[in-house]
Amino acid sequence: MLDREGFRPNVGIILLNARNEVFWGKRLREHSWQFPQGGIKYGETPMQAMYRELHEETGLHPEHVKIIGRTRDWLRYEVPDKFIKREVRGHYRGQKQIWFLLRMVGRDCDICLRATDHPEFDAWRWNEYWVPLDAVIEFKRDVYQLALTELSRFLRRPAQRAEKPRGPRVSRYPRVIGAQAQTLTIVDASVVCSEIEVEASTLDEMPPRVIVGK
């Protein structure tokens, strides 16, 4: 579904935890990471599309999140011709997105990447809000920057945990020493939510190269 100018309506989701860290999903069978996002179907409102995409890509339901804010208007980006399928060239220009900022009120183990039979991600992690954008594909960087900047006004100080700290926080980027394995939260068809070790070679770049397209 395209508008008169050739832009496809879309929603993007910035999901926060209590520490104001953001959810990043690893693209299925790729080394690319991104925020949850997807197209708005005919007849859907942006909010309806957001909740649908949230469940399809993270397994979360409306009761697991709280809407903190959204962008005031559409944020647009044009897609270079080399990334557009030949059959839609001349009609499709890019995407226009409404971005939602959500606060997760459920638990980490409520996240399930196999909520549908067409998963988008095969791993996920929390990262700092101001993730570097130099790894985002160039024509989409401005949209990420605009969304993060506009929605940052809704941020509050991270919630204070009542329980005793369990040790030092994980560093912003995983340390890679030779073939040493790193710990990454992964969800597959047989595990609802678990931590397993993966080879450091699968984490080529942190912050990850981000691909925003569906």
From Swiss-Prot:
GO terms for molecular function: pyrophosphatase activity. It is an enzyme of class 3 (hydrolase). The keyword Hydrolase applies. Residues 6-149 form the Nudix hydrolase domain. Its cofactor is a divalent metal cation. The keyword Hydrolase applies. Its EC number is 3.6.1.-. InterPro entries: Nudix_hydrolase, NUDIX_hydrolase-like_dom_sf, NUDIX_hydrolase_CS, NUDIX_hydrolase_dom, RppH. Keywords: Hydrolase. A motif (Nudix box) lies at residues 38-59. Belongs to the Nudix hydrolase family. RppH subfamily. Accelerates the degradation of transcripts by removing pyrophosphate from the 5'-end of triphosphorylated RNA, leading to a more labile monophosphorylated state that can stimulate subsequent ribonuclease cleavage. NCBIfam families: PRK00714.1-2 (NF001935), PRK00714.1-4 (NF001937), PRK00714.1-5 (NF001938). This is RNA pyrophosphohydrolase. The gene is rppH.
